[in-house]
Amino acid sequence: MTVMTDPMIAARGILKLLGQTVDEEDLTLAHESLDYGYPRTAVYCGVAAALQAEAPIAENFRQLIINEFAWPEAELKDVMDLLEHIPLKAA
């Protein structure tokens, strides 16, 4: 069992929210990454799954993804690039 740190809890919540618009089957890699203790990787995989599914993400949810983690600069750029190509969900 993985120890639940603040980033782990945040990632689990983000994946739960993504699961409302992305099939759970498409989030398998994200959940596996989280189970292995990699919350940022889990969120990245979840965002990639949302892009592939063309699932819209609201602006406040985008900000949560960006601001909830201490992203290394290169990873932050990758996440922002993915988010840029995902449709914006109307509030």
Language model region names:
Residues T2-A91:
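C-terminal-biased regions
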